[in-house]
């Protein structure tokens, strides 16, 4: 999903979204979640992984970060500063696995599906007011709904959360 601020992490709205994402991760942790699975995508996946690694390093050594990358060369075309953050995040993670051996058209979706299949609850930064597209993120949310997963949807600009039990539809 695209955000109004694009990839500008200096934008105030991005900072606020990242703070709320951190809050939701801590709420999940307080509710017993000890393993966080990410697809390591540029954006929310990387932000979430960095938040979890920060918590692991500072206060919660029992927390686990498990990275399911779409394929091994995922970050090849990323900007150098993002590649550096990506590889640091992978270095500090508990476990790493590439879902696909090489880049294929739906590799990102396959990584999301792997995570959804293993998860008890799925935390998404998502705007349900925007019509769904064929993006990997939209298809992953539809997949999570179809798998009857519990969802925590964080609205990227309103910074509200919507918790959806496994039996309900997010839309």
Report each predicted region and the residues it spans.
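Acidic/glycine-enriched connector segments
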Residues: 1-171
């Amino acid at each position: 999903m695209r955000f109004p601020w694009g990839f500008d992490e200096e934008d105030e709205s991005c900072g606020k979204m990242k703070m709320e994402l951190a809050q939701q991760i801590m709420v999940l942790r307080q509710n017993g979640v000890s393993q966080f699975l990410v697809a390591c995508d540029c954006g929310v996946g990387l932000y979430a992984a960095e938040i979890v690694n920060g918590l692991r390093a500072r206060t919660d050594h029992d927390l686990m970060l498990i990275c399911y990358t779409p394929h091994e060369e995922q970050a090849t075309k990323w900007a150098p500063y993002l590649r550096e953050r990506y590889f640091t995040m992978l270095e500090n993670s508990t476990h790493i696995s590439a879902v696909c051996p090489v880049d294929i058209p739906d590799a990102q979706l396959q990584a999301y599906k792997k995570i959804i299949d293993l998860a008890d609850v799925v935390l998404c930064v998502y705007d349900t007011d925007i019509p769904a597209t064929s993006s990997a993120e939209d298809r992953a949310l539809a997949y999570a709904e179809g798998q009857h997963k519990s969802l925590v949807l964080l609205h990227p600009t309103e910074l509200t959360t919507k918790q959806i039990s496994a039996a309900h539809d997010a839309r």
